[in-house]
Swiss-Prot record:
One Gene Ontology cellular component: recycling endosome
GO biological process terms on file: negative regulation of autophagy; recycling endosome to Golgi transport; regulation of autophagosome assembly
Record-linked SMART domains: TBC
Gene that this polypeptide is encoded by: Tbc1d14
Endpoints of the signal sequence: none
Record-linked PANTHER family: RAB GTPASE-ACTIVATING PROTEIN 1-LIKE (PTHR47219), TBC1 DOMAIN FAMILY MEMBER 14 (PTHR47219:SF21)
Domain of life: Eukaryota
Rab-GAP TBC domain span: 402-612
Induction (free text): Up-regulated in nephrectomized kidney.
Protein name: TBC1 domain family member 14
One Pfam family matching this protein: RabGAP-TBC
Compositional bias (Basic and acidic residues): 272-289
Length: 694
């Protein structure tokens, strides 16, 4: 039956009652009411005041809170004798909720219930088997009215669910006029009787006779101010939805009564919720035999290395399950010893690893602190007095340790100098010429190829086409110089401007790495100035102009110091015909920026800007000395592959330690003297060769 079917011409009406029960109690006469139903969607429930209840009732029983129950107007009642036959559960003190008392337009009159007879009890006990397996109430209600109900007198059973519980009430009527009622809680029941005659209603409460009448009397007398206000609004209740005031009332009920559930004989939720969580955790840890956690998270921070190994926290020595045979004493002792040995070994490993991490952290902090102090020294003492201090011993020692990145570009510019007197305006002119050349190449690139071979400047400018190919291979791991990268246009501009500035040199493979390192530390114009002056050095000019005679002279000078510092490895290379040009060309062309890690290459650049080309060959000897033991066991192919592809994780301190042991002095001659003597011999051989042939 739906709410919309309720009307004055229909026989279906609604009944709201409060069901309650108590062992040994009985209900005598309840009111047989004729009522007028109000549509449920427009009714507002009215609740009575809070009542004080007896202390003899159990405190741990189920409770529920109903909301949204329709309000009924009750007419003149007719006495209906009802009796409680069999009750199997106990009632709690808070289970009788006065706010859920039956509310109507007029108060319920008190009735004097009569005690049930013995025959009724016996019959009820004999027939009351609706729900025999549970601890809920099984109740028989007798309603011997003047009209007997036939089989056509059906009962519509509604399942009533409250806000806080999932409870139901089931009623059935047979032709014997016996009403079986099975109640799972003190939730309200809505029953609709379909009969041809006037409907008769029964309000049933499963509580004692005395307390039932007391509830109705107290409900009518002890009424609060809020309840009276709700009664005044009763005629207008159909203008509101039933949930408008019911939610407020139920929220107030929840605050007044902190309900608890008794589940499986455990402590009710009310007592558990009020318990301190820290106290509960402590009791659990004491029972489990585990140490309690410190109250503050700061106490979890280890202040030393004496700690439990993290790898063994999940490894717990436990006995066998109860359903398996117990371990023998010898086996259990053996397993315990093995477990303790595992824990000891894990502690040792983690202690060693922690010490290693601690050492690395200390070294890192020390390096950062030294860099910070060096920055102050460079900015406050050295750079303001560059001309007088750059060659002092203090500055040289500080220089060897590495220039801080924040001042590296400035120091490089001062150390390289500007002997070519290149200005920013000259860079703009060369860049504009390079862009014009790119446009001409895009429209008619065959002009350069058709020009006379004697115009070397035009041929060198044609090397602009090669720049695009080489830029994509510059520091590919960084992904900042490739097409679309943040430094692609800057690198392209510097290399293009240089080809126009020095058409006799043009672009040579390897220049892109040098320009890229300068861009990372300098602005575009300053990087172009440093790049042009750096390539103007004798060694770089010899290599980038591919002067074979001068290049061989540099290789010969290198081998002199190679034999002086590493005679064993030098002999091994001679035996395998591994010449210096196989690995030195790549190192010198790119100034180690391609062969070594970038941070290590920048540190080599620091000293190179101070000491010049000599340090480039000294660095090569330092690398050979660092891997001397490995190279002496390799043949030609493996040695060449190793030197052209050095390890990527070279420690800078180890490399510089090896470089510091290299002596750039042979037979009391330094690098410049040896190189000058070799150049003189080379010129004499070239001049004397024709006379020899004559």
């Amino acid at each position: 039956m739906t709410d919309g079917n309720l009307s004055t011409s229909m026989n279906g009406v609604a009944l709201m009652g409060i069901l309650d029960g108590r062992p040994g109690d009985s209900l005598q006469e309840l009111q047989h009411l004729s009522i007028k139903a109000v549509p449920r969607s427009l009714s507002v429930p009215d609740y009575g005041p809070t009542l004080k209840l007896g202390a003899l009732e159990d405190r741990h029983s189920l409770q529920s809170v109903d909301s949204g129950i329709p309000t009924l107007e009750i007419g003149n009642p007719e006495p209906v004798p009802c009796s409680v036959v069999h009750v199997k559960r106990k009632q709690s003190e808070s289970e009788i909720i006065p706010e859920r008392a039956f509310q109507s337009a007029c108060p319920l009159p008190s009735c004097t219930p009569s005690a049930p007879t013995g025959s009724e009890r016996e019959q009820a006990v004999r027939k009351s088997s609706t729900f025999p397996r549970t601890g809920y109430d099984s109740v028989k209600l007798y309603s011997p009215t003047s009209k007997a109900l036939s089989r056509s007198d059906d009962v519509s059973v509604c399942s009533v669910s409250s806000l806080g519980t999932e409870l139901s009430t089931t009623l059935s009527v047979s032709n014997e006029d016996i009403l079986d009622l099975m109640v799972t809680s003190n939730s309200s029941a809505i029953v609709t009787l379909e009969n041809d005659d006037d409907p008769q209603f029964t309000d049933v409460t499963l509580s004692s006779i005395k307390e039932t009448s007391d509830l109705h009397q107290q409900d009518c007398v002890a009424e609060t101010e809020e309840g009276r206000k709700l009664r005044l609004l009763q005629p207008f209740s159909h203008f509101f939805t039933r949930n408008l005031l019911a939610r407020k009332q139920n929220a107030r009920l929840d605050r007044q009564r902190d309900l608890g559930w008794k589940l499986f004989g455990k402590v009710p939720l009310r007592e558990t919720a009020q318990k301190d969580s820290k106290k509960t955790q402590k009791e659990y840890e004491d029972k489990a035999g585990r140490p309690s956690r410190p109250p503050s998270p700061k106490q979890n921070v280890r202040k030393n290395l004496d700690f439990e190994p993290l790898s063994t926290t999940a490894l717990i020595l436990e006995d066998r399950p109860a359903n398996l045979p117990a371990k023998p004493a010898e086996e259990a002792q053996k397993h315990r010893q093995q477990y303790e040995e595992m824990v000891v070994q894990a502690k040792k490993r983690e202690l060693k690893e922690a010490q290693r991490r601690k050492k690395q952290l200390e070294e890192r902090c020390k390096v950062e602190e030294s860099i910070g102090n060096a920055v102050l020294t460079w900015n406050n003492e050295i750079l303001p007095n560059w001309e007088t201090m750059w060659c002092s011993k203090k500055v040289r020692d500080l220089w060897w340790q590495g220039i801080p990145p924040s001042v590296r570009g400035k120091v490089w510019s001062l150390a390289i100098g500007n002997e070519l007197n290149i200005t920013h305006e000259l860079f703009d002119i060369c860049l504009a010429r390079a862009k014009e050349r790119w446009r001409s190449l895009s429209t008619g690139g065959s002009e350069v190829e058709n020009e006379d071979a004697g115009f070397s400047a035009a041929d060198r400018e044609a090397s602009l086409e090669l720049i695009k190919l080489d830029i994509s291979r510059t520091f590919p791991n960084l992904c900042i110089f490739q097409q679309g990268g943040p430094y692609h246009d800057m690198l392209h501009s510097i290399l293009g401007a240089y080809t126009c500035y020095r058409p006799d040199v043009g672009y040579v493979q390897g220049m892109s790495f040098i320009a890229a390192v300068l861009i990372l530390n300098l602005d575009t114009a300053d990087a172009f100035i440093a790049f042009s002056n750096l390539l103007n050095k004798p060694c770089q000019m010899a290599f980038f102009r591919v002067d074979h005679g001068l290049m061989l002279t540099y290789f010969a000078a290198f081998e002199v110091f190679f034999e002086e510092n590493l005679p064993k490895l030098f002999a091994h290379f001679k035996k395998n015909n591994l010449t210096a040009d196989i690995y030195l060309i790549d190192w010198i062309f790119t100034l180690y920026s391609k062969s070594l890690p970038l941070d290590l290459a920048c540190r080599i650049w620091d000293v190179f800007c101070r000491d010049g080309e000599e340090f480039l060959f000294r660095t090569a000897l330092g690398i050979l000395k660092l891997f001397e033991d490995i190279l002496t066991r390799m043949d030609f192919i493996h040695s060449a592959q190793f030197l052209t592809r050095l390890p990527e994780d070279l420690p800078a301190d180890d490399v510089f330690a090896a470089i510091s042991t290299v002596q750039m002095q042979s037979r009391n001659k330094k690098w410049a003297q040896v190189l000058s003597a070799l150049q003189k011999d080379s010129r004499e051989m070239e001049e004397g060769s024709p006379s020899v042939r004559d």
